[in-house]
Design a protein with these regions (language model features):
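Extended, subdomain-level signal for the structured scaffold at the beginning of enzyme domains
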Residues: 3-169
């Protein structure tokens, strides 16, 4: 009976250690943190539910969508550590897929024109549609326009845009 209890205690201890490791945020090589392996398993998916909707009457005009994205890569937490953040790839790229299928072009800006920060840890690696639109938009995401310049120079007289899109993150 004593050996059984010791064995059971060992199994419980290993389970607690595994749970602790799985729930601890992961430090990146840059010294920032991303969600724990358990959080990533529970809150992200390797695919999306994008169904490649075909719109019967896609937009055929010249107006575009202006996507305003974040360029902020890190958020300082209460303990002083930095959490890697940015635009969530699914919350940004799935709407772009739908907008493109609906007939719209999308322009990309960030507050100062620095590259769009993307939470790459949340990228659905097995989703071909998301990977394709990411590759298509990579240049725009790396070299976006500046929202500050847009507001100063173009906003007052701009009739180029049908909507402004603020993706989540």
């Amino acid at each position: 009976m004593k050996k059984i209890l010791i064995g059971l205690a060992g199994i419980i201890l290993l389970a607690f250690i595994a749970f602790y490791i799985a729930t601890k945020p992961t430090e990146t090589k840059e010294g920032t943190y991303i969600p724990s392996p358990l959080a990533l398993k529970l809150a992200t998916s390797p695919t999306t539910d994008f169904d490649n909707t075909i719109y019967k009457n896609p937009y055929t005009g010249n107006k575009k969508i202006l996507m305003v994205s974040t360029e902020e890569r890190n958020m300082t937490m209460a303990n002083g550590k930095k959490f890697s953040t940015g635009n969530h790839p699914v919350e940004m790229l799935l709407p772009i897929l739908h907008l493109k299928n609906a007939g719209f072009d999308v322009d990309v800006v960030t507050p100062t024109g620095k590259p769009v920060a993307i939470e790459m840890w949340a990228m659905p690696e097995d989703d071909e549609n998301v990977k394709k639109i990411y590759a298509e938009f990579k240049h725009k995401l790396e070299k976006p326009g500046s929202l500050a310049n847009f507001v100063t120079n173009s906003l007052k007289d701009s009739t180029d845009y049908a909507a402004i899109f603020f993706p989540g993150g």
